[in-house]
Regions:
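Helical element adjacent to the flavin cofactor pocket in flavoenzyme catalytic cores
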Residues: 142-197, 201-208
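Short beta-strand to alpha-helix junction loop
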Residues: 61-72, 96-106, 142-161, 313-323
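Glycine-rich active-site loop/strand segments that organize a redox cofactor
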Residues: 43-73, 82-88, 274-310
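Flavin-binding catalytic cores
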Residues: 216-218, 235-236, 261-340
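Glycine-rich FAD pyrophosphate-binding loop
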Residues: 25-49
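Flavin-dependent oxidoreductases
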Residues: 19, 181, 188-287
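Dinucleotide-binding Rossmann-like beta1-alpha1 core, especially the glycine-rich loop
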Residues: 52-128, 138, 255-256, 277
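Beta1/beta-strand and adjacent pyrophosphate-binding region of the FAD-binding site
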Residues: 2-16, 34
């Protein structure tokens, strides 16, 4: 057992865990913190496997915590990146309607974004948005100038550096899984640590960590995997920045879109398929406990029953490059199979 007692222990070394650690350490420099990350490096799961988009706050219900946190978080994130010379670009994005039904939803999306405090939103005709993205087709688009791209893994590691530079007594421990905790003792794969307080930032295992702490939740995490293709070197010129479809309001997914990464690559995706392993990143990834827990949850069954057709289409696209391409061609008709 470690003899030292820490003021706060944070479980989870993704961007949420390290942002929490950084803010606490910045505001209370004398606090002794310890961060536990079960993988060998920080930002290994969701933080390091997303498309790197800085979302503006366009989609979320006005007045919700999601809307408020997205807008304020974006401002803080950009400020931090600028102050620390980190790689980011507020390049803006267009949301493209491909038919009249989507055009009406796009009008409402603009109103929603303005109510959330976004500035510079502008509806564009095809002639106008093709000056931004010449290869994109559609009936109307929404210009969102406050969206951008960033390296979230780099941000997370910079948070870690800042924590250690403010207080050298604070620790960030990787390859260290939290097994159990009781009162002020935390049992890990690297021994027992003592802490006055514990903050859980456990990503896809947040619900299980809460259950260990005897928190009764009505909700449960159900894993969905998103797969991406990359545009070929030759096809990269067909996209300048970020191009999104108008999202279907029935689902929490934004649809297959195009994203320029900070390294210049162009990603196309993702789809959204139920995964049989929470932290599974391949089509064959499987974990019995994760699968049984997800399928026994009433929310999962309700989702499958109500939206089986959507789910089936996503799985078909998951195993068919031609179907994936067909979805991408709705916005960029000139794309061909060899482009992805």
């Amino acid at each position: 057992m470690q003899n030292k007692e820490y003021d706060i222990a944070i479980v989870g070394g993704g961007i949420v865990g390290l942002a929490t650690a950084f803010q606490l350490q910045k505001n209370f420099p004398k606090l002794n913190l310890v961060v536990f990350e079960k993988e060998k490096e920080l930002a290994f799961h969701q933080t390091g496997r997303n498309s790197g988009v800085i979302h503006s706050g366009l989609y979320y219900k006005t007045g919700s915590f999601k809307a408020k946190n997205c807008v304020e978080g974006r401002k803080q994130l950009v400020k931090f990146a600028k102050e620390n010379n980190l790689n980011y670009d507020i390049c803006g994005k267009i949301v493209v309607a491909i038919n009249e039904e989507e055009s009406k939803r796009l009008d409402q999306l603009k109103i929603n974004g303005e109510q959330n405090g976004l500035v510079g939103l502008k509806l564009l005709t095809p002639e106008e948005f093709q000056k931004i993205e010449p290869n994109v087709d559609g009936v109307k688009a929404l210009w969102v100038p406050e969206s951008g791209i960033i390296d979230y893994k780099g941000i997370t590691n910079k948070f870690a550096d800042k924590v250690k530079s403010i207080n050298s007594e604070s620790l960030i421990i990787t390859d260290c899984e939290v097994k159990d905790y009781k009162e002020n003792q935390i049992k890990t794969s690297k021994g027992i640590y003592k802490s006055k307080h514990i903050i859980f930032c456990g990503g896809l295992f947040a619900d299980r960590l809460a259950a260990k702490d005897k928190v009764k939740l009505e909700m449960q995490i159900v894993g969905f995997r998103g797969d991406y293709y990359e545009l070929s070197e030759k096809a990269k010129s067909k996209i300048n920045n970020l191009v999104y479809p108008v999202p279907n309001p029935e689902f929490p997914f934004l649809g297959v879109h195009f994203t320029r990464m900070t390294n210049g690559d162009i990603e196309c995706g993702p789809n959204a398929v139920f995964t049989f392993k929470r932290e599974g990143y391949s089509k064959t990834a499987f974990n019995l406990k994760d699968t049984l827990q997800a399928l026994s949850f009433s929310g999962t069954r309700k989702l499958f029953i109500n939206h089986w057709k959507f789910g089936l289409n996503e799985y078909n696209r998951d195993f068919s490059k031609s179907l994936f391409l067909k979805e991408l061609q709705k916005m960029i008709p000139s794309l061909e199979m060899h482009d992805i």
